[in-house]
């Protein structure tokens, strides 16, 4: 068995699944070259245009090879350790809740900065990557 295969065989299921999904999405980005701004988190487009898919896609799309490489290395290290402690189901729920809550927080803070201080640019900003 190669080192890579041995390393992959030691990664727990939920961690491996989220890593595989992110790598597959990045592969799609490289092959199809979709306009990244169609998938990024943009609070105004989520709130006013009801593009709720951005809550999930913004966490799966990455801006560069370095971006995904660093995220996947940290996901492998931290996610594997955490998943061994809390189990696969809890890890999957933690990842899901993490995606939803970080997106909700980002949207809420952007809207609040717009509503209170008139910072419209916060509502129009696009972000990408597993936050």
Identify the role of each PLM range.
Residues 3-127:
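N-terminal TM1-TM2 helical hairpin plus the immediately adjacent luminal interfacial "cap"
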